[in-house]
């Protein structure tokens, strides 16, 4: 057993506390933009405090956690860190709004082998921007510098969001019925799902990521941040009786739409009602991917599907378009017979 000739520090072991403090200083103004009146105290406490909004009579908390998946691999490889924070918030807050919940607060977890303050600042500023878009407060998080756990510049992200909904207004799909209409909200791209397959397509096709598609590089199509639908849908919920909403994420149409349908109902989707964004056609062609697999892996241009009474379609579409959404009638709910699949794409 030998004793070091010079004293060891945490920094010698690979953990730079000063870098962590520099990151906190860098993000303070961005985090401040997300503040809600219910938040108590400031960033940096042992626990973050948040009151329930007083407008709720019987508030129910709704929680969700998610990550960005292997989209991070592309972001790291191409040094495009600004938008993955938006993706992180979107994946959580879009899941909450499906229940009718207003996102209240968000916490993030950023883990890396060696903290790069510039990269981490870009990521957290993106998280703050996502919180602004969702209307929730970034009230805390964890930055974990863990030498030996991650290689090189790699890092990982996870997010946790809590929202609130009036107990009597929870949307759980039980009101969905035969004859309901289905409205689609356009996605901004692949969002944050299917990236292991996307990376495989890039590998086998040997495609140039800078290849121009519809006026911008392929890599920009792929890394376009996930669309956040929260504020538009909260407006819709104020004025319309929405029966169900489905966030089209991993598992695509086949897996996500049935999650909000009663057993005796199926969704009939009219594939002629929209054109896939060019990036999905490129993936299908260059990966030789079947149409079934495309609908099972990707959103194919549809980020959210909404079920509501058929006589409310026109007013709902008008409202959503006023809120800046590209929305259209994509199909309807029909009676399901026996063991039929719960999604039928025509």
From Swiss-Prot:
Superkingdom of the organism of origin: Bacteria
Main location group: cytoplasm
GO biological process: 'de novo' IMP biosynthetic process; adenine biosynthetic process
Annotated EC: 6.3.3.1
InterPro entries: PurM-like_C_dom, PurM-like_C_sf, PurM-like_N, PurM-like_N_sf, PurM_cligase
Catalytic EC class: ligase
One Gene Ontology CC term in the entry: cytosol
UniProt keywords, alphabetically: ATP-binding, Cytoplasm, Ligase, Nucleotide-binding, Purine biosynthesis
Subcellular location field: Cytoplasm
Pathway info: Purine metabolism; IMP biosynthesis via de novo pathway; 5-amino-1-(5-phospho-D-ribosyl)imidazole from N(2)-formyl-N(1)-(5-phospho-D-ribosyl)glycinamide: step 2/2
GO molecular function terms attached to this record: ATP binding; phosphoribosylamine-glycine ligase activity; phosphoribosylformylglycinamidine cyclo-ligase activity
Reactions it catalyzes: 2-formamido-N(1)-(5-O-phospho-beta-D-ribosyl)acetamidine + ATP = 5-amino-1-(5-phospho-beta-D-ribosyl)imidazole + ADP + phosphate + H(+)
NCBIfam families given in the database record: purM
Family as reported in the entry's similarity comment: Belongs to the AIR synthase family.
Listed name of the protein: Phosphoribosylformylglycinamidine cyclo-ligase
Underlying gene: purM
């Amino acid at each position: 057993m030998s004793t070091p000739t010079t004293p060891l520090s945490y920094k010698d072991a690979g953990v730079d506390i000063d870098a962590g403090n520099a990151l906190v200083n860098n993000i303070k103004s961005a985090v401040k933009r997300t503040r809600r009146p219910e938040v108590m105290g400031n960033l940096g406490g042992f626990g973050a405090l948040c009151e329930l909004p007083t407008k709720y009579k019987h508030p129910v908390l709704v929680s969700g956690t998610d990550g960005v998946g292997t989209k991070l691999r592309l972001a790291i490889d191409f040094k495009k860190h600004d938008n993955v924070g938006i993706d992180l918030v979107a994946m959580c807050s879009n899941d909450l709004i499906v229940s009718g919940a207003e996102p209240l607060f968000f916490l993030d977890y950023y883990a890396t082998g060696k903290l790069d303050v510039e990269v981490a600042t870009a990521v957290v500023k993106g998280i703050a921007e996502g919180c602004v878009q969702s209307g929730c407060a970034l009230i805390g998080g964890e930055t974990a510098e863990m030498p030996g756990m991650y290689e090189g510049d790699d890092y990982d992200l996870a997010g946790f969001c809590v929202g609130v909904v009036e107990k009597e207004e929870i949307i759980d799909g039980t009101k969905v019925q035969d004859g309901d209409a289905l409205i689609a909200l356009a996605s901004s791209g692949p969002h944050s799902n299917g990236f292991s397959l996307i990376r495989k397509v890039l590998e086998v096709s040997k495609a140039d990521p800078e290849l121009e598609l519809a006026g911008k590089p392929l890599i920009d199509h792929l890394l376009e941040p996930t669309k956040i639908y929260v504020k538009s849908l909260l407006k819709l919920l104020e004025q319309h009786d929405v029966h169900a909403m489905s966030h089209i994420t991993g598992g695509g149409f086949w897996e996500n739409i049935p999650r909000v349908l009663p057993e005796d109902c199926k969704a009939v989707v009219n594939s002629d009602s929209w054109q896939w964004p060019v990036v999905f056609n490129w993936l299908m062609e260059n990966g030789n991917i079947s149409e079934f697999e495309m609908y099972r892996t990707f959103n194919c241009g549809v980020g959210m599907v909404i079920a509501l009474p058929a006589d409310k379609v026109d007013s709902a579409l008008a409202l959503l378009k006023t809120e800046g959404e590209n929305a259209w009638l994509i199909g309807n709910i029909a009676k399901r017979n026996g063991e039929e699949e719960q999604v039928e794409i025509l």
